[in-house]
Amino acid sequence: VDGDGQHDPSYIPELVKLIEGGASLAIGSRFLVETDGFQSTFMRRVGIRWLSFLLELLTGKVVTDPTSGFRACNKDAIDLFCKSYPDDYPEPESIALAMKLGLPVMEAPVKMNERQGGRSSIGGFSSVYYMIKVTLAIVLVCWVHRGDK
């Protein structure tokens, strides 16, 4: 759960249900169902769709909200992330790593709120850096782990 108020803690039980149902990584997605919750800017949604497309292309699995930080993990995912977790924009890259290593990744629909405080680390020129960096990181993770499972 982010500390900026975007994630409604009332959805935590939904993520826990996915973990109890066999997911190693559960992601709260604002795109699984249409809600009246906060939706990010058009350009950010384009970027999210690009990352979703890239993950599906390289892993064969669909993740509708790969930038969501509203997540829960089981022991297997925690063990993996303790050994290897990106420290710069980690969400999409860590999803690719988990999927390439055969960990089940599932999403639950959640409603996101508008940021209550702080500023996004992604904006202006940094958004270009973010998209290039994360795209290359996903490609590299998928290439390095292409035969793993």
Model regions: which residues?
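The conserved acidic donor/metal-binding loop of glycosyltransferases
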Residues: 2-6
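Catalytic donor-sugar/metal-binding loop of nucleotide-sugar-dependent glycosyltransferases
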Residues: 61-62, 83-86, 95-113
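Conserved residues at the C-terminal ends of beta-strands
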Residues: 1, 29, 111
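Acceptor/aglycone-binding surface of glycosyltransferases and processive sugar-polymer synthases
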Residues: 7-88, 115-132
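DNA-recognition element of transcription regulators
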Residues: 92
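Residues at helix-coil transition
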Residues: 20, 56-59, 100, 140-144
